[in-house]
Amino acid sequence: MSHNLKQLFQQHKVKGLSINSKTVKDKDVFFAIKGRNTDGNAFIKDALSKGAVLVITDNKKNIVIDKVIYVKDVQAALHEAIEIFYPKKPKNLIAVTGTNGKSSVVSYIAQTHSLLGKKAASIGTIGVEIFGCDNLINDVPELTTLDYLSFRKIAHNLAENGIEYLVFEASSHGLDQARLREIKVNIACFTSFSQDHLDYHHTKENYLLAKLKLFINHLLPNGIAILNSDIEEIEFVKDYLHNHNIKFITVGKKGDLEITRINCSLKGQNINFTFNNREYNFNTPIIGSFQASNLLIAVLSMHYTGFAFDDVIDSLVEVKAVKGRMERIDNTNIFVDYAHTPDALEKALTELKNIKLHDSKLSVVFGCGGNRDKAKRSLMGQMAAKRADTIIITDDNPRNEDPKLIRAEIISGIEKADYTEIANREEAIKYGINNLKQDDILLVAGKGHENYQIIGDKKLPFDDAEVVRKCVKVCHPVA
């Protein structure tokens, strides 16, 4: 590096780093990086106007601007700067990938650490959750896997405040775009795999290989991969990891940790499993048999981090469901779930169908996001038609697409089943609640924890759970 960055930063009394001109603060250094969709060089003047004390670029055309410094490799300069400003990380790092279940597993692992007396945090779709001390983090970018700078900023802050264990989601996009760079983890988990994000990856094979980069590129040599044995492609995954000399263990109905029986009800479930030739049993208030494997993936991650197995099992009764993940709203038979893939929707509906009373009905309200994988829309309609008695199609973050066309693509998969189409999501939820009878169950799917609705380029306040609560007060459904 031709410039001594540490000396430069001291000279200009630099306070922070940024790669986004929108987030630049006074005395920051702005790194003008050319990305997939935007070029940071186009925002140099914007960054300077917001108080950037220096700009670093690999585009020579911009060095005529005052305070702009040229380097041959801006990414390498950013990496060096990160090591200067944000060198610390929690000692124990655990990463979780999978189509569905990532948010649940990272939360379960972090919660369990806290229940066993350790300071832990999780990063992912829901944001940053901190257990065992006050919440320290604000202004987290809305990405499942953060950009490398944001990740290191947060990790440094957590380490500075005594967090020992950090669990984070690793999305296929983040892995494919190498957002984690050289981050290495002690444990890497694979929760599930089914169709999603084909608008980005194009093929299911590319999507799977992107997921597997977590294990190949980021797992420490002495680390372990924890896999859901019920993944359809599990044999391919096992062979792939074996060929790369990666140690792994499986969880599931055919796993090394074998789930033998699950009894579910509206109040939770009782789970039986065997591990190392011993039988175990535990209760959890968390609903959904698919959560059994998520909870037990969390158990094994704790076990291989050095915690006593029996202590971990004993703590599970206190682990809470994640917001928007099969979340039962107050004392009603109405559930909010993030299910936004065909597989997740089918699993959520199957669970609720299995625990409802014989003569009661199961209804679902859902839509599909705009500017996202179009191929899954008809499949989600198909899954709803297979599992639900009443289907209400509505809007779910249509973004810049015509919402009517999105709904039509969903409806094309419903075929002969009856459905109701209500564009306005609040009205759709209200309609679903109004039509509930004694012991009926309603699933509001697709948004989960989200507290917004994206229409065009506008992000409007909208929270499924809060809308349900509001409608319940008006409609007084029978719980």
Curated annotation (Swiss-Prot):
GO cellular component, one term: cytoplasm
Residues that bind meso-2,6-diaminopimelate: R372, D396, N397, P398, R399, G446, E450
EC number(s) given by UniProt: 6.3.2.13
A Pfam family hit: Mur_ligase_C
Principal location listed in the UniProt entry: cytoplasm
Keyword Iron-sulfur: no
UniProt modification remark: Carboxylation is probably crucial for Mg(2+) binding and, consequently, for the gamma-phosphate positioning of ATP.
Residues reported in the UniProt entry to bind UDP-N-acetyl-alpha-D-muramoyl-L-alanyl-D-glutamate: S21, T144, T145, S171, Q177, R179
UniProtKB keywords: ATP-binding, Cell cycle, Cell division, Cell shape, Cell wall biogenesis/degradation, Cytoplasm, Ligase, Magnesium, Nucleotide-binding, Peptidoglycan synthesis
Similarity remark: Belongs to the MurCDEF family. MurE subfamily.
Protein name: UDP-N-acetylmuramoyl-L-alanyl-D-glutamate--2,6-diaminopimelate ligase
Species per Swiss-Prot/TrEMBL record: Rickettsia montanensis
Designated gene of the protein: murE
